[in-house]
């Protein structure tokens, strides 16, 4: 990968011609010639404008030739890489000799290629250093071109380069490139603003027509692969440097980027083009965000002359620049580029540390990874940042007095520069050159690398023992460091890009080129080959063995390398992919074809089109040739040399003089934590995880509903904490994220011609995944995946198609929360993990599960440090220093009695506004219409169910929706706590909770008190009653806090036992089901301070109820069907417990206020086609939403008694007839033919066999089958999870028997019902009447917990 970049620079610099001393005189002469030509052409233009302009017909060709385009592109065919092939680089690397090909005896190039030529009306004019000149170019369509064709490619006449700046390679014939003969009658003149290649754009002609050719360019493959049509070249706005009679594409470096700052108008032009590309890539072209961003950029450029790219734009631009690099053979890896944004670095020591971290990350102990580090951008060209090395790692070259060179001949000049700066070398063959960098336009500093940072590979041969005696070696990491990164008009003069080697770059170029190590003849003699005559092919034999040695040496030491055959195949795959995705792939055939094996590689036989796109990587002149030395330093002898710094000195300086800077530098890698939550538990864990990651990363946290999905492709580290709602659904704030992820998956499949007909929607995919996968996998999922398998040994796997996807550069881990009482346990978290993997993401860990039934907190506390450690290892950060602090922070909250307090406040707001802010929801204040009405005839052991009517003016909802009620804790519980807390003087005084926080300023660190960001000012009594969860058994983290405030040693030891013994805690928690007051009474010496306790308590979450009314039946009202929950703990023998919300609602009286919000349940709405049959299945309070359904049809019937209503069957279940809810209403509905049939299942009625709703479904399935299958009816299931699963399995079994289908076919059928929104579920959790299910689920969870390593 790096070959293309690295070699370009090594050999490019070696063959660079020194500047002429009269360069200024030549430039003046060129300008004078230019002015004369302009005058002549203007005269011709005036004559031509008197005639009718003719249009150039393009039906026979996609391009123009003849005098088609001005030559003189300063960078010309310079591209971004050399003919040598360092794979995974935006350009090339180590050497250039194999690029051009030597002439054969017939005068034809030995290397098979054919380039289109460009004709101009005048000799080539090349602009250097950013000079702007206006030129008129005449197109007469008269040029011709020829080229030799090997491998079946013939000579073509009249091949030309198109105005769009493209050049065809590998034998393009004239019939496809020449303009129509009819267009050669009259010259056509075009004016153009000419600039350097690093910043030139095509403009319109005099008639306002675009110069870009719009016709596809046909590219053949001589070996018989499908031909492709390239239209991407139409977007190439840069000018090639070929002339009418000369193709210069085989010249290594036609020109370098200008050193002057780019002008504002040109930056504006580039920025507009780049933003269009960026917003197109995220499918937001012309959106409000696009227009706003363009306005910001334009304003900044007009004000300051430049602008700052966002981090996401920078990452996108870096990847796209690599993708656009026409000379790189390893571009299939373009999306797997790790971008290190170091634009904040302002010193050479900071640059050195960042580069050391780059090398450490990219080397990765031999498992190389592609990466780019980007330093601050160019502003005025007087304060540039530069890396003076052509490669970060290279060997010194010493020229002796007798002309002999020790070391690498390519680096002789730079070695002399280092010596002048004061570097002391050993003078040996394999000295690693120091890093030389300059910051902000200042003179350079040099730094010696720590020896352990550089990985070198001694070269051996699998057959020749004498080979190791040659003492050859090479370094593992090719890292180009002198190219200019050009993106959106902004130029980054200091960037370093690294990938991995292709074997020929080392074996053929670096070691065998005569201008490099020149080992070819030495090896041949050792092999006892006849070197006297070329007919013995001794060179060919020797170079093959040299490449075998290189591959053998790297692979045997598990260092990433790729052979040229694999690289060629990967490029062909990339070429094919790009042709499908972008309708083109810029490619320089001369540089793509490897320097070994030529025509037996597939790339040799592929026609290619050469053109240049932005963003791009550009050549620069060596820094030591352009640097303006301060006070003559570096110009004269005897001056004090620049100071040398070594790694330890820098580390010490950072540690003691700028701890803050060092911390910021180590956190330049962004880590994003996403969460989706229904109760707040996932958010709580996500915040803890974000704090943990913050010890080593730039950690950020987002709720999924607030996250911009377009950013996900550019994340470096993504950690997801996701709850599952109901029976496998995402929480409300995760719905959109799940849909967007699934849309990415569908798009990725369609782009690669794949179709997955088995999964039709994200929800069905979620349930299918969880049903198939979870129960097969033990909870020992917290297991590290061996990432060493990815690139070890033969790296042909590196280029397999399966390793790429839109998220191929994202490392991720998922912690899934849920309850194993549900069949689709943790379905949403598992879905996110599956789909991130399918989109190409790299797992740090397999998905980990947190089971609400048992050990959820224990699982999280075990998983979080592990994922932190692996993340540090992945990004080559040292976890040892921060892991202990991070783990301590995870175990112990940072709040103490000294950092939290309650102070009087006069800012008490209304309860609805306070709850809205606290829960981040719009909360409405409503009133009870009357005292709740009892729906059951009480009998012994019967559970009370009531109908609550609420006045809710202005609240909009649909039948099937839910309402969230914010309850209040019982008064006895609140009063008991107030008596046990320390620091409560007046519980009815309005207080504000404040936290002591540290702030960083230019004057240092200072502390100040700030209000809690969520807990509002209120009385302590109201806070405990309305805002905090006091009834859920306290977590082990809270018990740890309470243990610290026990005065009695025995109480403290018992609490610590619960904290440290997971099994003891789970037994105590599920047996006692203690609320907070119970704990304080069980441990009487524990008296925690009120401020600290409030800061640790979790929010009192809303309780959700299905709405039992239709807004068209009862305007401005909401009806609820509520079961009153009361039970006893300790297997029915302990204290009585009360459901928080149901008992709160049962105590309401007329006009009492209650606080609520509506949550839409789109998946449980009535069908849009009201003619379809409806089957309602819901025992107990599961009937609640169905009342809203039948009320809706009552309204329709009242409005139009003749209207035909759908068939509606109701399956209802209860214990006995005394608790048959809405019995009278149902009877009236049947009478009015709104309910067609009503089935009642009684499970505890005397003298009647025990019957459940699923039993009735099985009995009536023949009729139900007609409704479901033949009439395409809808099934609605509402109730607890156990009932819903039984119903599902019953329908599944009945369909299998009815249609004689396999289990897989039935499962597919039911998933299809979900996809078609014909199988609807509204499921709530385990109810107290299913305690046996609760116990069974918990036992299963404990078994899984015990199986964890």
Curated annotation (Swiss-Prot):
Main function: Catalyzes the conversion of L-arginine to L-citrulline producing nitric oxide (NO) which is a messenger molecule with diverse functions throughout the body. Truncated isoforms (isoform 3-isoform 6) are able to form intracellular complexes with the full-length protein and serve as dominant negative inhibitors of the enzyme activity.
Binding sites annotated in the UniProt record for heme b: 328, 619
Ranges for domain Flavodoxin-like: 671-868
Keyword Metal-binding in record: yes
MF term (GO), any: NADP binding
BP GO terms, sorted: arginine catabolic process; imaginal disc development; negative regulation of cell population proliferation; negative regulation of DNA replication; nervous system development; nitric oxide biosynthetic process; nitric oxide mediated signal transduction; regulation of heart rate
Record text on cofactor binding: Binds 1 FAD.
Region named Disordered: 23-195
EC primary class: oxidoreductase
Pfam families from the UniProt entry: FAD_binding_1, Flavodoxin_1, NAD_binding_1, NO_synthase
Protein name: Nitric oxide synthase
Every FAD-binding FR-type domain range: 928-1167
Comp. bias regions, Low complexity: 24-51, 64-73
């Amino acid at each position: 990968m790096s070959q293309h970049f690295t070699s370009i620079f090594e050999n490019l610099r070696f063959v660079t011609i020194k500047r002429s001393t009269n360069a200024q005189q030549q430039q003046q002469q060129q300008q004078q010639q230019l002015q004369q030509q302009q005058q002549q052409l203007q005269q011709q233009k005036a004559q031509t404008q008197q005639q009718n302009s003719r249009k150039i017909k393009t039906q026979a060709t996609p391009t123009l030739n003849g005098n088609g385009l001005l030559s003189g592109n300063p960078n010309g065919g310079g591209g971004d890489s050399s003919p040598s092939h360092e794979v995974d680089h935006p350009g090339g690397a180590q050497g250039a000799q194999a690029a051009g090909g030597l002439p054969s005896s017939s005068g034809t190039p030995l290397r098979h290629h054919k380039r289109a030529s460009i004709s101009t009306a005048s000799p080539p004019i090349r602009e250097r250093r950013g000079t702007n000149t206006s030129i008129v170019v005449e197109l007469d369509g008269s040029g011709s071109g020829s080229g030799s064709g090997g491998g079946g490619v013939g000579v073509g006449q009249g091949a030309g380069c198109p105005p769009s700046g493209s050049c065809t390679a590998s034998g393009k014939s004239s019939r496809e490139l020449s303009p129509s003969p009819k267009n050669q009658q009259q010259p056509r003149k075009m004016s153009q603003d000419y600039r350097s290649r690093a910043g030139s754009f095509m403009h319109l002609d005099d008639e306002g027509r675009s110069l870009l050719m719009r016709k596809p360019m046909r590219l053949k493959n001589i070996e018989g692969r499908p031909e492709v049509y390239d239209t991407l070249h139409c977007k190439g706005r840069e000018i090639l440097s070929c002339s009418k009679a000369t193709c210069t594409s085989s010249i290594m470096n036609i020109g370098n980027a200008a050193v002057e700052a780019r002008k504002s108008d040109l930056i504006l032009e580039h920025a507009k083009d780049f933003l269009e590309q960026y917003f197109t890539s995220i499918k937001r072209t012309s959106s409000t965000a696009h227009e706003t961003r363009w306005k910001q950029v334009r304003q900044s450029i007009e004000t300051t002359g430049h602008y700052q790219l966002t981090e996401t734009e920078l990452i996108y631009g870096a990847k796209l620049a690599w993708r656009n690099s026409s000379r790189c053979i390893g571009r299939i890896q373009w999306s797997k580029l790790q971008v290190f944004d170091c634009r904040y670095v302002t010193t050479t020591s900071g640059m050195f540390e960042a580069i050391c971290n780059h090398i450490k990350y990219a080397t990765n102990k031999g498992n190389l990874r592609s990466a780019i580090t980007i330093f601050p951008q160019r502003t005025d060209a007087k304060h540039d940042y530069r890396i003076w090395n052509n490669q970060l790692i290279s060997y010194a070259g010493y020229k002796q007095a007798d002309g002999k060179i020790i070391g690498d001949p390519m680096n002789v000049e730079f070695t002399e520069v280092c010596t002048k700066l004061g570097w002391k070398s050993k003078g040996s063959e394999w000295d690693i050159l120091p890093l030389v960098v300059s910051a902000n336009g200042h003179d350079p500093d040099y730094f010696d690398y720590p020896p352990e940072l550089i990985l070198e590979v001694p070269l051996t041969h699998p057959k020749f023992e004498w080979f190791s005696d040659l003492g050859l070696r090479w370094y593992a990491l090719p890292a180009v460091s002198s190219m200019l990164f050009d993106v959106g008009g902004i130029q980054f003069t200091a960037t370093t890009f690294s990938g991995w080697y292709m074997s020929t770059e080392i074996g053929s170029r670096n070691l065998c080129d005569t201008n490099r190590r020149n080992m070819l003849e030495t090896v041949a003699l050792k092999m006892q080959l006849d070197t006297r005559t070329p007919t013995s092919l001794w060179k060919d034999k020797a170079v093959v063995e040299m490449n075998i040695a290189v591959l053998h040496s790297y692979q045997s030491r598990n260092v990433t390398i790729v052979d040229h055959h694999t690289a060629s195949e990967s490029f062909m795959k990339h070429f094919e992919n790009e042709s499908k995705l972008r309708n083109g792939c810029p490619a320089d055939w001369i540089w793509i074809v490897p320097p070994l094996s030529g025509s037996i590689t597939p790339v040799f036989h592929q026609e290619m089109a050469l053109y240049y796109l932005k963003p791009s990587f550009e050549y620069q002149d060596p820094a030591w040739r352009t640097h303006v030395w301060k006070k003559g330093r570096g110009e004269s002898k005897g001056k004090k040399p620049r100071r040398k710094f070594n790694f330890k000195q820098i580390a010490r300086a950072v540690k003691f003089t700028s701890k803050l800077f060092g911390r910021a530098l180590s956190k330049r890698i962004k880590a994003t934590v996403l969460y989706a939550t229904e109760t707040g538990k996932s958010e709580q864990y996500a915040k803890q995880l974000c704090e943990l990651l913050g010890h080593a990363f730039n950690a950020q946290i987002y709720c999924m509903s607030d996250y911009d999905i377009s950013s996900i492709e550019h994340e470096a580290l993504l950690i997801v904490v996701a709850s599952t709602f109901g029976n496998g659904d995402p929480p409300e704030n995760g719905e959109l994220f799940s849909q967007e992820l699934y849309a990415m998956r569908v798009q990725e499949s369609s782009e690669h011609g794949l179709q997955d007909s088995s999964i039709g929607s994200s929800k069905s995919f979620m349930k299918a995944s969880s049903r198939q996968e979870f129960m097969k996998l033990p909870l020992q999922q917290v297991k590290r995946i061996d990432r060493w398998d990815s690139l070890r040994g033969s790296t042909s796997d590196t280029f397999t198609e399966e390793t790429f996807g839109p998220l191929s550069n994202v490392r991720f881990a998922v912690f899934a929360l849920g309850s194993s009482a549900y069949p689709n346990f943790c379905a949403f978290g598992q879905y996110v993990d599956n789909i991130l993997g399918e989109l190409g993401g790299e797992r740090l860990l397999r998905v980990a599960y947190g089971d609400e039934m048992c050990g959820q907190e224990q699982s999280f506390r075990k998983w979080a440090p592990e994922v932190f450690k692996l993340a540090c290892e992945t990004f080559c950060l040292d976890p040892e220093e921060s892991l202990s602090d991070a783990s301590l922070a995870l175990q112990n909250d940072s709040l103490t009695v000294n950092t939290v307090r309650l102070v009087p406040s006069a800012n008490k707001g209304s309860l609805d506004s306070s709850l809205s802010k606290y829960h981040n929801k719009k909360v409405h204040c409503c009133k009870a219409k009357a005292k709740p009405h009892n729906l059951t005839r009480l009998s012994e052991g019967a559970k009370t169910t009531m109908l609550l009517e609420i006045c809710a003016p202005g609240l909009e909802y649909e039948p099937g929706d839910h309402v969230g009620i914010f309850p209040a804790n019982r008064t006895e519980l609140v009063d008991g706590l107030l008596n046990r807390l320390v620091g409560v003087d007046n519980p009815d005084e309005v207080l504000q909770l404040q936290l002591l926080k540290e702030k960083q300023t230019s004057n240092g660190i200072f502390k100040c008190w700030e209000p809690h960001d969520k807990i509002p000012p209120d009385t302590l009594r109201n806070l405990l009653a309305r805002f905090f969860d006091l009834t859920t058994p306290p977590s082990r983290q809270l018990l740890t806090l309470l243990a610290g405030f026990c005065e009695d040693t025995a109480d403290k030891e018992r609490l610590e036992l619960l904290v440290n013994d997971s099994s003891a805690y789970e037994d105590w928690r599920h047996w006692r089901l203690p609320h907070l007051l119970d704990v304080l009474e069980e441990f009487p010496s524990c008296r925690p301070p009120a401020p600290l306790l409030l800061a640790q308590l979790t929010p009192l979450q809303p309780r959700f109820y299905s709405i039992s009314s239709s807004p068209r039946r009862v305007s401005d009202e909401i009806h609820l069907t509520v079961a009153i929950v009361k039970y006893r703990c300790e297997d029915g023998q302990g204290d009585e417990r009360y459901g928080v919300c149901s008992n709160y609602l049962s105590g309401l009286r007329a006009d009492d206020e209650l606080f609520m919000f509506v949550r839409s349940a789109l998946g449980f709405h009535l069908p849009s086609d009201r003619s379809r049959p409806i089957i309602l299945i819901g025992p107990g309070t599961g009937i609640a939403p169905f009342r809203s359904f039948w009320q809706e049809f009552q309204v329709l019937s009242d409005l139009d008694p003749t209207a035909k209503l759908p068939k509606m069957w109701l399956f209802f279940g209860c214990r006995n007839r005394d608790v048959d809810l809405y019995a009278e209403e149902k009877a009236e509905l049947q009478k009015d033919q709104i309910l067609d049939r009503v089935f009642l299942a009684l499970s505890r009625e005397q003298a009647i066999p025990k019957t459940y709703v699923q039993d009735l479904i099985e009995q009536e399935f023949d009729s139900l089958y007609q409704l479901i299958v033949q009439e395409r009816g809808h099934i609605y299931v509402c109730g607890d999870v156990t009932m819903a699963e039984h119903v599902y399995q019953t329908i599944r079994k009945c369909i299998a028997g009815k249609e004689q289908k396999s289990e897989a076919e039935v499962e597919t059928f039911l998933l299809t019902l979900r996809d078609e929104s014909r199988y609807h579920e509204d499921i709530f959790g385990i109810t107290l009447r299913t305690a046996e299910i609760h116990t069974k689920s918990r036992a299963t969870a404990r078994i899984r917990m015990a199986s964890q390593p």
